[in-house]
Curated annotation (Swiss-Prot):
Catalytic reactions on record: ATP + H2O + aliphatic sulfonate-[sulfonate-binding protein]Side 1 = ADP + phosphate + aliphatic sulfonateSide 2 + [sulfonate-binding protein]Side 1
GO cellular component: plasma membrane
Main location: membrane
Quaternary assembly: The complex is composed of two ATP-binding proteins (SsuB), two transmembrane proteins (SsuC) and a solute-binding protein (SsuA).
Taxonomic placement: Bacteria, Bacillati, Bacillota, Bacilli, Bacillales
Name of the coding gene: ssuB
Source organism of the structure: Bacillus thuringiensis subsp. konkukian (strain 97-27)
Family: Belongs to the ABC transporter superfamily. Aliphatic sulfonates importer (TC 3.A.1.17.2) family.
Single GO MF descriptor: ATP hydrolysis activity
Gene3D superfamilies, A to Z: P-loop containing nucleotide triphosphate hydrolases (3.40.50.300)
Domain ABC transporter: 3-231
EC number(s) per entry: 7.6.2.14
Mode of membrane association: Peripheral membrane protein
Keywords: ATP-binding, Cell membrane, Membrane, Nucleotide-binding, Translocase, Transport
Official protein name in the record: Aliphatic sulfonates import ATP-binding protein SsuB
Length: 251
């Protein structure tokens, strides 16, 4: 078992009282699983991701990664935010290396490997202002994976990109997953993206956020968004939103 999320609940304190954001979240991921999490705005998807990342310790329950209870960020977790968060004064290769020295041959070789994997050959010496948003997000992906984390956590990383760039980065991410078999938890609002990428879809309800349904996705890769089997699964997911009373708050 790579990741185990056990009975996780989360509360926020407000002037009007205590608000429960997450209620009794339980699910497990084996090594190499690709799980997408979808649900209405405000259902706690991003909050759950931050808890798994060790960025939020004020919760009930526990997160176990590779047999170790998580209480803070570590090399076990890679995190990709909605925005790339690159350092503008560092080049592409320096951003990927982050706090590691490119003078170290092992680090330099690893950076070179990831530059090739995310298809940024020739842009190693470029600065963030000199590359596109999609390229910047590829740098963020490479940076998060450089240390070979046990799980990669992605918080709507392609949400702000145009459709063409988003589609391209989906292919880049799938290529990485197929090569490295990194365990991934990917938060998205896009049902098609959830179906296209993952082998399991976790649907959350809101107020408080809890798991409404987990759907296994057994479509073979590469997936065709216009195929009958893809559309049938899309209908199945949409029906869960409708039957669960989620669709009114998800639009």
């Amino acid at each position: 078992m790579t990741v185990s999320i056990n009975e996780v609940s989360k509360y926020f304190s407000k002037q009007t009282g205590t608000v429960q954001v997450l209620e009794n979240i339980n699910f497990q991921l084996e090594k190499g699983d690709f799980v997408t999490v979808i649900g209405p705005s405000g259902c706690g998807k991003s909050t759950l991701l931050k808890i798994v990342a060790g960025l939020d310790n004020d919760f009930e329950g526990e997160i176990i990664i590779d047999g170790e209870r998580i209480t803070k960020p570590s090399k076990k977790q890679g995190f990709i935010f909605q925005e790339h968060r690159l350092f503008p004064w560092l080049t592409v290769e320096e951003n990927i290396a982050a706090d590691l020295s490119l003078k170290d041959k092992y680090v330099k070789d690893k950076v070179k490997e990831w530059v090739e994997i995310v298809r940024l050959d020739g842009f190693e010496k470029s600065y963030p202002k000199e590359i596109s948003g999609g390229m910047s997000q590829r740098v963020a992906i490479a940076r998060a994976l450089l240390r070979d984390p046990s799980v990669l956590l992605l918080d709507e990383p392609f949400g702000a990109l145009d459709a063409f760039t988003r589609s391209h980065l989906q292919e880049v991410l799938l290529n990485i997953w197929e090569q490295k078999k990194t365990t991934m938890i990917f938060v998205t609002h896009d049902i098609d993206e959830a179906i296209y990428l993952s082998n399991r879809i976790v649907i959350m309800s809101a107020k408080p956020g809890e798991i409404h349904k987990v759907i296994e996705n057994n479509l073979s890769y590469p997936r065709n968004k216009t195929s009958q089997s893809f559309q049938q699964l899309r209908t199945k997911v949409l029906q869960q939103f409708e039957h669960g009373g989620l669709i009114q708050t998800s639009i």
